[in-house]
Amino acid sequence: MNCNSEQEQQQQQQQEQEQHRVTKMKIMVFDTETTGLPPKNRQCTDPAQWPHIVQLSYLIYDTNADKIHELKDVIISLGTHIPLPDESVAIHGITRTISLQQGIDIRIALFDFKMALTQCSKCVAHNLEFDTRVLQMEAQRNRMSLYFPASFCTMKVSTDLCKLPSPYGLGYKWPKLLELHEHLFQRVPKNAHNSKIDTIVTLRCYHMLVHNEDLCRSSREFRALFRNHCTIECERDELGEFGDMNEMPSPPKPTELKEKND
């Protein structure tokens, strides 16, 4: 990628962040766990080539009220006919038994997701392109349609902020969600590869990237949610549940982190 292209991409990302920063809205943050990897050709439109969803999680956050309106987390029933490789189970921990006993029909999950999506002006995800494609392929399999509003990918927007070296030697690699969270807050959340946890973590990262504000400091509701789902015991003592949020150590803001890395 040449210098002009990099500058144009950075300017576009800055414009997107500024647009999100000044606009108050309801946003949907979502994540999926799947039966496997996407096809090598990400533009493939054949649903048979795409993995199935085994867990779908999303939340609706009102930036006007600074409040979570809905938090949904469902396991999907794969039946006995959809392959569920052991290597995928090793990542997300959802076995065939869990899927059969706790899962719901994918059509119900998609309908609820679609209705929730209509309430929102923006959707947010980490590696958004993958999650939207997986959802669209599931919708296509079930003769449904999904339309996503304006979107924000925390992975792509934060690439130049995290500055993680590419294994291929050119530019920076896309940061994983835990890498981004560690970069912003100097801690690694627990229970990764659970789409509910990843959704909560993504919201915290998004809010810091766009609003320069840590929700664990500014929102008692979110702080309790994050404390109960995403922290280890020693971090819970630091976060507290009913203590003074102003006593928490402030993480560096993204602008400060950028200056340190430059």
Indicate residue ranges for each PLM-predicted region.
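Conserved non-catalytic scaffold segment of RNase H-like nuclease domains
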Residues: 2-6, 18-142, 171, 175-185, ...
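Acidic two-metal-ion nuclease catalytic site recognized across multiple nuclease folds
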Residues: 2-6, 17-22, 183, 196, ...
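Active-site catalytic microenvironments for nucleophilic, acid-base chemistry
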Residues: 138-142, 160, 164, 183, ...
